[in-house]
Amino acid sequence: MLAIFLETLNITAPVFAMLFLGVLLKRIDWINDNFIHTASSLVFNVTMPALLFLGILHADLHAALQPALLIYFALATLASFALAWGWAIFRCPREDRGIYTQGAFRGNNGVIGLALAASMYGDYGISLGAILAALVILFYNTLSTIVLAVYSPVIKSDPWSICKSVISNPLIISVIAAAPFAWFKIGLPGWLETSGQYLAQTTLPLALICIGGTLSLAALRKSGSLALSSSLVKMIGLPVLATLGAWLWGFRGAELGILFLYFGSPTAAASFVMARAAQGNHELAAAIIVLTTLMAAITTNVGIFFLQWGGWI
């Protein structure tokens, strides 16, 4: 357990380093709101699609394709989304419901979830986690686009407009484009893959610096209760329900452990990028990311300990 706890800290500490760097750079006026807006757009349209494309390109789709696991994960994700949105309707002002919902169901599986899966289960964790990550990207971005479109002042919410928003989402386009390359094991020219890696490697630091640049004590106080509520749903409520459902479904061992890690991951940095693109309450999105990442160091270890104590993983 100490090794898992230290692994979690090794993953979350760099995240907070980038967040606090963003706070510092904004405080000393080395970055401003214009930079944050432009950089967030760059991440959403260019660097994050490159990261997702390369991540799927390198996944072994043949080795870890488990239909039952994928079906359960898809159903549990849809149920989590519905529960989070339903709770937001009763809990939030209308203009914040999309941001609240996205923060409560969208996990950082591509970074923290996958890293912990690899730490616990080695190559098997990487291959199975990568397959789930591909499904996650498609579901999370589609559902996030839908819920943000319903409440966004700049995104139309009629069915055709929502469909267009989903289809034209750069993150979804990158996932769909990468799938045949991964399935048929088609490589990219060396120079092109290296160039893509350069872009991909800027994604997380740049996104986190932008998040840190938006943080302020006033913003945290303003969105404190909503951010805390969404964070509790994300880190305690939904992971408990989803993991219990997986246990009842019959999953044990590595499959149950990886499902827990994915459902228990903190809110993804991409939620801030999409919130800003939709002209939503990005300060609330940033606060949820910070709170859930803090909570993850505790909830992940407690959950793993409990599952190991019960002999289920």
Segments the model singles out, each with a brief description of its role:
Residues 1-313:
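Alpha-helical transmembrane segments of multi-pass small-molecule/ion transporters
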